[in-house]
Amino acid sequence: MFTTKKPLLLLFFLGIISLSVCEQERDADEEDGGEVTEEEVKRAALKGCWTKSIPPKPCFGKR
């Protein structure tokens, strides 16, 4: 029982950190008027680039 609690606690902790970072980025984005920079566009393109194959393969530059 204790061995399953550690990974779950770690996942919960990492999820909370991730949500906090997203909230900070969202707040910062609202402060600067919601303008999208070129870097954010590139980052979003790379995030959505993974296919559902097993193992996942990146599609660098291909859409």
Swiss-Prot record:
A Pfam family reported for this protein in Swiss-Prot or TrEMBL: FSAP_sig_propep
Cell compartment(s), UniProt: Secreted
Biological process, per Gene Ontology: defense response to Gram-negative bacterium; defense response to Gram-positive bacterium
Key words of the record: Amphibian defense peptide, Cleavage on pair of basic residues, Secreted, Signal
Tissue-wise expression: Expressed by the skin glands.
Proregion residues excised on maturation: 23-41
One cellular component (GO) term of this entry: extracellular region
Annotated signal sequence range: 1-22
Family: Belongs to the frog skin active peptide (FSAP) family. Brevinin subfamily.
Protein name: Odorranain-B1
Species this chain originates from: Odorrana hainanensis (Odor frog)
Organism ancestry: Eukaryota, Metazoa, Chordata, Craniata, Vertebrata
